[in-house]
Curated annotation (Swiss-Prot):
Catalyzed reactions per annotation: UDP-N-acetyl-alpha-D-muramate + NADP(+) = UDP-N-acetyl-3-O-(1-carboxyvinyl)-alpha-D-glucosamine + NADPH + H(+)
Catalytic residues in the record: R168, S217 (proton donor), E287
Biological source species: Rickettsia felis (strain ATCC VR-1525 / URRWXCal2) (Rickettsia azadi)
Known cofactor(s): FAD
Gene: murB
Record's function text: Cell wall formation.
A molecular-function term among this protein's GO annotations: UDP-N-acetylmuramate dehydrogenase activity
Gene3D superfamilies xrefs: 3.30.465.10, UDP-N-acetylenolpyruvoylglucosamine reductase, C-terminal domain (3.90.78.10), Uridine Diphospho-n-acetylenolpyruvylglucosamine Reductase, domain 2 (3.30.43.10)
Protein name: UDP-N-acetylenolpyruvoylglucosamine reductase
UniProt GO BP: cell division; cell wall organization; peptidoglycan biosynthetic process; regulation of cell shape
Length: 295
């Protein structure tokens, strides 16, 4: 019998995750949990005596939830984890804060170095995990440290060096939930910051299918190469499986054309990886996370 810890937050059983993802596909979470605050989350983790599998869920922007759903407990940090504070020349930002919202806050307060976040969908927590980046900037360039909690309920702190940022990854333990990120602050000019953010937005609109059901970049760029060029060279621009296709506008973006399943999207991605390897000898690595049971 499934026994859930007593919490202040909210549980939902057999909860559909489809509407929470940018692709709008996928199955249900066996248990969906939104903790009230970090102490509530710690209490849940400490009480998880059955060792229920734990999956963390952010803004759903760079993720495929498989059609079979997710076993165990899927944890989503809500509004109580999205605060932005300016303390002692540092920004302290909750992990569920959207990258876009932090970029706007920084522009309004004449803080430079965060302009690139306006072009990165998702949350601060997800950005840290992926070392997300665009337009010649990455999270590793602005992070001082993070505050996190492990699956045993222990609060931990990691400095930038300890995080071990790499291209689209890091050396953090896998059984970790990021709670806050601390950023260094460099003052700039609000108008110049806004101009740069507008340049980024205009570039995205011109080159990326941002109005489609997409999950952002599908594959990380191999060293010294561009994934989209390899995909294009293999003749896969616009290639379709079921309701999923590679974008005609930017062929490193997958699109749900309205009737795709998670299987369509993942099968398309795997097919593209196979064909690019056959064509160029390069093994593309997924940038989009795939979670749950493949069916």
């Amino acid at each position: 019998m499934l026994i859930l810890p007593i919490v202040k937050g909210e549980y939902k059983k057999d909860y559909s995750l489809k509407h929470l993802t940018w692709f709008k596909v996928g199955g249900n979470a066996e248990i969906f949990f939104k903790p009230f605050d970090s102490e509530d989350l710690a209490s849940f983790l400490i009480q998880n005596k059955q060792k229920l599998p734990i999956t963390t869920f952010g803004a759903g922007s760079n993720i495929i939830i498989r059609d079979g759903g997710i076993e165990g407990v899927t944890i989503k940090l809500g509004q109580n984890f999205s605060n932005i504070e300016f303390i002692d020349e540092h920004l302290i930002v909750g992990s569920s804060c959207l990258n876009y919202n932090l970029a706007k806050f920084c522009q309004a307060n004449a803080i430079t170095g965060f302009e690139f976040l306006v072009g990165i969908p998702g949350t601060i927590g997800g950005g840290v995990v992926m070392n997300a980046g665009a337009y010649d900037s990455e999270f590793k360039d602005i992070i001082v440290k993070i505050e996190a909690i492990d699956f045993a309920g222990n609060f931990l702190t990691f400095t930038n060096e300890e995080i071990g940022f790499k291209y689209r990854s890091n050396n953090l333990p896998k059984d970790l939930i990021i709670l806050k990120a601390v950023f260094k602050v460099n003052k700039g000019d609000s108008e110049n910051i806004l101009l740069r953010m507008n340049e980024i937005n205009n570039a995205r609109s011109a080159t990326q299918p941002i109005k489609e059901r997409t999950g952002g970049s599908t594959f990380a760029n191999p060293e010294g190469l561009k994934s989209w060029e390899l995909i294009d060279k293999a003749g896969l621009r616009g290639y379709r499986i079921g309701g999923a296709s590679m974008s005609e506008l930017h062929c490193n973006f997958m699109i749900n054309n309205g009737d795709a399943t998670a299987k369509d999207l993942e099968d398309l991605g795997d097919f593209v990886r196979q064909k690019v390897f056959e064509d160029s000898g390069v093994e593309l690595k997924w940038e989009i996370k795939r979670l749950g049971r493949y069916v």
